[in-house]
Design a protein with these regions (language model features):
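N-terminal beta1-alpha1-beta2 submodule of the flavodoxin-like/Rossmannoid cofactor-binding fold
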Residues: 1-117, 182-215
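Short aromatic-enriched loop/helix-cap "lid" or pocket-rim segments at secondary-structure transitions
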Residues: 49-53, 143-144, 173-178
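Beta-strand-loop-alpha "switch" segments that mediate conformational coupling across diverse proteins
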Residues: 162-173
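Short, glycine-/small-residue-rich phosphate/pyrophosphate-handling segment
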Residues: 99-100, 113-164
């Protein structure tokens, strides 16, 4: 049975990132009805990023190629490593992915990215990967260089990710309650009503396409 693991790196379980992840999952399920699709909300877990202990690089060790830190995120790291499709969804905070997503990727990727010749990867599966980003800024302000950097590491260990974005997101249910002068609520609402559904459809279609091409 095919396994799809979707990692939601947003603190919101029903926000824009979660909705994009959900749309992707629905696309997968339509194409692969017997697939196991699991969504993981990182903010439900108490964990930290890489501790630089280098246990995963120790010659002859049983931990070689495996993160040795035993905490609540460990079972998720193990599931992710065996997935057929991996999805990393994150809001953009301060021109970067969320801290929780960064910490998770440190733990997941570094254990498999060896210092052997050619920086050999020892991931148990070269799974297909998608990245989903949501942000409250327009497309021209998307931090392409920053996300491309982390995607290069993901691509080295697994496969180069397929990227899906949602821009100019609607942040608050009631803008009148917040001090917001740099965004126009009406234009944000129009974007949400007209464009966000198109972005959700793109996530849905990507889920279908990746499920169709699963090996």
């Amino acid at each position: 049975m095919n396994s799809v693991i979707i990692i939601n790196g947003s603190p919101r379980k029903d926000g824009n990132t979660a909705k994009m992840c959900r749309a992707f999952a629905e696309g997968v399920k339509l194409q692969l009805q017997d697939a196991t699709v699991e969504t993981v909300n990182l903010y439900d877990f108490d964990f930290k990023g890489c501790r630089s202990c280098f246990a995963c690089k120790l010659k002859g060790s049983k931990n070689y190629g495996h993160c040795s830190v035993k905490d609540s995120i460990m079972p998720i790291l193990e599931k992710a490593a065996q997935a057929d499709i991996l999805v990393f969804g994150s809001p953009i905070f301060l021109i970067d992915i969320s801290a929780q997503m960064k910490a998770f990727l440190e733990r997941l990727i570094f254990q498999f990215a060896t210092y052997e010749a050619g920086y050999k990867t020892i991931a148990p599966k070269r799974c297909n990967v998608a990245t989903i980003y949501t942000m409250n800024v327009p497309k021209e302000m998307f931090p392409e260089t920053i996300v491309a950097n982390i995607e290069s590491f993901i691509g080295h260990v697994f496969n180069q990710p397929k990227r899906i974005c949602a821009f100019n997101t609607y942040q608050f249910s009631d803008y009148s309650k917040y001090a917001v002068e740099v965004f126009d609520e009406e234009s944000k609402r129009k974007y949400r009503d007209c464009i966000f559904p198109v972005e959700l459809e793109a996530a849905f279609n990507m889920g279908m396409k990746m499920a169709e091409n699963i090996e």
